[in-house]
């Protein structure tokens, strides 16, 4: 599937317009990016079954115009960053690589460990600065001294030039407001998709403040695992009616939801990568939006 050709059900006029972008820290990126987690398997704990194919997916992403790749040193662990470096180094100037620190297998980290995590990412990716790094929390919660210490460590890393932007991940509305009142936040990465909209208040606060909102698991769960998004009768029926695929419906719903949404769907398949990118050209009509509003309700 050609990324430049609209999928069936798309607005043909969209393909002739510039791709939609939104600020990610000090730069602007295309709203459709790529999440590299699945290159280390469904739960990011293995080497890729086909390293050559994994490298090919990354190169295809950049060739297709993706300029925002999400990763983490603990994917594998020590696998995905190495793949990115092998596939793409020296990196295109416009490529924004975003990583995350703060949680390793659900264990929260202190300021010293956060700094070490940032340095590990820089080393493995062979860069002097990352476009942004997300402070990943075990779960959304209350503001406390530990959160302030972690946030201060991230700000120091930005002030020292190790990262261009401070991001947050898995945060509550209270934590977002507290952080954004004290420093510039580049992006927020929370669980959000058609069937799980608990972070809607966080998304709206990000929109109000001009912060990029990056839903993780935008398609529900990795392909091959049962999930309430891609198997939803409403999503499937909408895809059939519009002549597109269920993932394209789910991704375009997110894009139409708010202009600050940046997508990072993951896949280990070049075909699926291009299918996901083609979601940019899909138009969800009023009927589709009405019916999709009830998914997960």
Feature-to-residue mapping (PLM):
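N-terminal binding-site loop/beta-alpha segment at the start of enzyme catalytic domains
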Residues: 2-95, 153, 220-222
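Active-site mouth loops of central-metabolism enzymes
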Residues: 39-52, 101-112, 141-142
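Short, acidic/polar
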Residues: 47-61, 109-124, 172-176
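A short, structured active-site edge motif that brings together acidic residues
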Residues: 94-105, 133-136
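CE4/NodB-like, metal-dependent polysaccharide N-deacetylase domain
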Residues: 113-135, 156-160
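Beta/alpha (TIM)-barrel catalytic core signal, keyed to glycine-rich beta->alpha loops juxtaposed to Asp/Glu
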Residues: 11-16, 138-297
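A structural motif
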Residues: 66, 127-130, 163, 185
């Amino acid at each position: 599937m050609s990324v430049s050709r609209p999928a069936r059900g798309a607005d043909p006029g969209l393909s002739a317009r510039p791709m939609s972008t939104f600020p990610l820290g000090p730069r602007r990126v295309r709203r459709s990016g790529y999440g590299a987690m699945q290159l280390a398997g469904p739960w990011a704990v293995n080497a890729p079954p086909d390293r050559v194919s994994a490298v090919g997916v990354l190169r295809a992403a950049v060739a297709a115009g993706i300029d925002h790749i999400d990763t983490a040193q603990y994917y594998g662990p020590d696998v995905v960053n190495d793949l990115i470096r092998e596939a793409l180094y020296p990196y295109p100037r416009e490529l924004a690589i975003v990583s995350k620190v703060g949680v390793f297998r659900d264990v929260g980290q202190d300021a010293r460990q956060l700094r070490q995590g940032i340095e590990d990412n820089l080393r493995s990716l062979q860069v002097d600065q990352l476009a942004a790094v997300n402070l990943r929390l075990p779960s959304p919660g209350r503001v406390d001294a530990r959160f302030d210490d972690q946030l201060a460590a991230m700000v120091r890393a930005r002030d020292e030039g190790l990262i261009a932007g401070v991001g947050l991940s898995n945060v509550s509305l209270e934590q977002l407001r507290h952080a954004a009142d004290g420093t510039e936040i580049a992006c927020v990465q929370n669980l959000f998709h058609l069937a799980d909209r608990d972070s809607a208040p966080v998304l709206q606060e990000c929109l109000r403040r001009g912060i990029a909102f990056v839903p993780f698991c935008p398609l529900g769960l990795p392909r091959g695992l049962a999930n309430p998004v891609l198997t939803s009768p409403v999503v499937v029926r909408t895809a059939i009616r519009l002549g597109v695929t269920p993932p394209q419906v789910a991704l375009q719903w997110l894009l139409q939801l708010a202009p600050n949404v940046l997508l990072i769907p993951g896949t280990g398949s070049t075909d699926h990568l291009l299918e996901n990118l083609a979601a940019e050209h899909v138009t969800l009509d009023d009927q589709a939006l009405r019916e999709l509003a009830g998914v997960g309700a």
